[in-house]
Amino acid sequence: MAAPILKDVVAYVEVWSSNGTENYSKTFTTQLVDMGAKVSKTFNKQVTHVIFKDGYQSTWDKARKRGVKLVSVLWVEKCRTAGAHIDESLFPAANTNEHLPSLIKKKRKCMQPKDFNFKTPENDKRFQKKFEKMAKELQRQKTSLDDDVPILLFESNGSLTYSPTIKINSSHHSAMEKRLQEMKEKRENLSPTSSQMIQQSHDNPSNSLCEAPLNISHDTLCSDESIAGGLHSSFDDLCGNSECGNQERKLGGSINDTKSDMCISSLVLKTNNTHLSPSFAHLDKSSPQKFLSNLSKEEINLQRNIVGKIVTPDQKQAAGMSQETFEEKYRLSPTLSSTKGHLLIHSRPRSSSVKRKRVSYGFHSPPKEKCKRKRSIRRSIMPRLQLCRSEGSLQCMAGPALEALGCGESSYDDYFSPDNLKERNSENLPPKSQLPSNPAQFSCRSLSKKERTSIFEMSDFSCVGKKPRTVDITSFTAKTICSPQKTASGEGCATFSCVTSEESSAPEETLRYCRQAGPQQKEDAWPEGNGFSYTIEDPSLPKGHDGDLTPFEGILEEVKEAVGLKSTQDKGTTSKISNSSEGEAPSEHEPRSVVDCNVERSAEEKENLPGGYSGSVKNRPTRRDVLDGSCDSFKDLIKPHEELKKSGKGKKPTRTLVMTSMPSEKQNVVIQVVDKLKGFSIARDVCETTTHVLSGKPLRTLNVLLGIARGCWVLSYDWVLWSLESGQWISEEPFELSNHFPAAPLCRRECHLSAGPYRGTLFADQPVMFVSPASSPPVAKLCELVHLCGGRVSQVPRQASIVIGPYSGKKKATVKYLSEKWVLDSITQHKVCASENYLLPQ
């Protein structure tokens, strides 16, 4: 440490860099302390010296007002080197901003990092006060609790202790605790209020309790937590003759000319409180679901013969009551068809507090016989359920989920299991608004590769290119195949039907296959021989359209927009859609439906795509025979995009853009705008593909001259900014630098009018030139400029009549030795300048 030569000095240091971004006060503070001076962190009354450089104006004014000595940093340095207290008047401080107007306040921002000290109650008073306040509040809350109020506390080991202040016995249970215990003992459904308790009906003692809960909520329709179960309902339940076990759902109506004791195995669709069309009740089928299948062989026969055939109780008893697993292809019957008359299915709007519902349906089987629950892990695509009628009308007023029977197992345990967490959370959602006329589109999670392949294997693209129509394939089984004559008479199962454009007033339907989550609709067809319906949705079916069903014939026609390529179309492989029997003209079949396919699937998936499922009902060709054409045409449309993907991210734009005389900040802006608006690729130098040259400043650079010679647009930087503002590339003419470069618009017009590759004619009449190796710009660029303007360049000087640039060899009297500026000025002005002004000294 140096001698205390400045022991009587109390200094305040304010030393900044000239631009106000760096604070150097710490360095001089250390030097002053070493010399024995005291350094104050604030400008107080004890301060005797102010070391000032480019500091605040307020500090300068305060020092002048108090008469404190203002010295520069040179005074500190001189004292240190001399080892003595130097006179302050020799090194006065200077204030460069003293005479500047005070209206402009210069903001200072020190870029140096500060020392970070972690705040603790010990070193931070504010933090200490906050900490003490929180501790007092916590203590007050603990002492304010009454001793007789039971509370819940979590112990250190994670266990839950109930009311530690009072020993709990059976008499101190809360009302909710008693309610939970009662429901567990009685195996009742959980509900927070007594008004929603399930009232079991015991009118028919012969009915066995065969239940399996099914609650597919709005949220779980698109999740992996969906579960399904075997569904059992009696004919009496459907007719409203006996009450269901669950009062939340009521089934009523009448079916004429049938027996009241006939049992029907059916699905009950519970959707939102919405009036659907008379023909369909749609269900989101895009989610993989786990189905619980417990139907017997007899029930399968009932379900497959539900239309046009009456099964008596005697026949049912003869079929046997042995329970067996419902095979995968019989997972859920997508059709509930009525024979004659009217069938009404009503459902109350689902309240947010209803957790799980159980319904017991009568079925003639031993009373103690129970259904076994079994969860299937296989993911599948749920078809949209449809309620088809042959001679009557069908109404479906439903809530947001499929509902089935509760199983004999404990609903209490099911409710609190982790598997049902999503299901319980989704039930708190508010009811959806009324559906529009076209089917609702549900958001779904992104599909895996296996699911996308499964969807395409079972998709029918036959309706693409047609106007809105409905194709109903109901109860199409392997054992019982109904003929079109039965369909027309209303006794058989509904076959392929098509509503022509004259009959259907519904809005167009967009079939989409999308990889990411979003509004989407997907077609689905069951595997061959499954005996189930396949629906291409249309929101409505005309009321008068009972038995007059038109055969549907058609295959894929246009999928060119499916992969986003408008120009890709294989006319040889695409198949035309035949007209319906109503006599529609081909011109009426405009391609209004689009299958939006994700083109990022692997080539293996595309090769494995079978065709869609379509064909004439009368001829009944096999599905694979009918759909080879649609499959091939779809593959051909996808192949070009697949090749693009293999070769890279697509073909780069053929136009290039060159920047010149532009700082890096503007260059970054241009690059970002080009990335956003597309259409250009950035090049460093002007080349054959360059069409635009952007100049940050109107300077004559090589790129500008090359751009003029090639007939490019020479534009200002503002063109990019205005294009970004408009969201697209705008007209270039208002931003052309024609004032600074008159030749630019002239060469550009000549380039546009030229039939072949453009080459200027500026130097076409000039003799052969030789460009000196010592010329500037470089020889190669200068030769290129001369060539582009129609001139001829020789490699040796003896063949040339004009020598461009400094030449050190033997000079001839017949040869003109001109400066490089002659070429540059001639190109800029688009005329051959007088050579006398550019002669080099001999």
From Swiss-Prot:
Keyword terms: Cytoplasm, Cytoskeleton, Phosphoprotein, Repeat
Keyword field contains Secreted: no
GO biological process, one term: mitotic cell cycle
Biased amino acid composition, Basic residues: 346-359
Biased composition (Polar residues): 434-443, 566-582
Basic and acidic residues: compositionally biased ranges: 586-608
Domain BRCT: start-end pairs: 1-93, 647-737, 758-840
Assembly with partners or alone: Interacts with CDC27 and maybe other components of the APC/C complex. Interacts with histone variant H2AX under DNA damage conditions.
Stated role: Implicated in chromosome condensation and DNA damage induced cellular responses. May play a role in neurogenesis and regulation of the size of the cerebral cortex.
Protein known as: Microcephalin
Gene name tied to this protein: MCPH1
